[in-house]
Amino acid sequence: MNMDKNLRDRYEALKKKVVHRADEFANLMDFLENETAWLTAPASTRFHLCRESGLLEHSVNVAETLLRLRDTLYPLIDDESCVIVAFLHDLGKIGMPDEALYLKNHVSPEKARQYGKPVAPYTYNRNLTYLSIPVRSLYLALPYINLSEEETQAIVYHDGQYVEDNRSVANRESPLTLLLSYADNWNAFVVEDGMENK
């Protein structure tokens, strides 16, 4: 896969920030880069960064934003935790090593006209066992890397109050969870969805 050089440089620079768990992280990245759709998966089926490598670009954007927010609001969180949760928060969107979660939608233009509305470029792979994105993220990552409670909470609850299941953590979010949620939303709704230019 030919990744945009700027994206690759940003990605590689962020990976170097993981130092205390460098070996675990390197093994995880090797697995993701060589056995999964991590480098090619879209970030969504029809919205932000709905294109090849969109998930990787989104994860890099979130990591960079999270580091900036952390610097300003809560410098006690280390670089390593920021990069790890940013890279893993939507990891479940890759699906499984042998099956992607998001598949190209091969609906013909004629069929699309029959629907009377635009057809999403990607569709969900219904052959995979249903797991929420955060649960699949942990399922994929935990065999390779140990996570702190705060990192686990951040990954599981990064969608904040947008998800009904997350109500149980309301008012009990760690600073890392709050910052990841904001970095994720900022990028998905403002930067990547084009609102910056509206």
What does each model-identified segment do?
Residues 10-14, 65, 136-140:
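A general alpha-helix detector
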Residues 32-35, 66-69, 158:
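Alpha-helix boundary/capping residues
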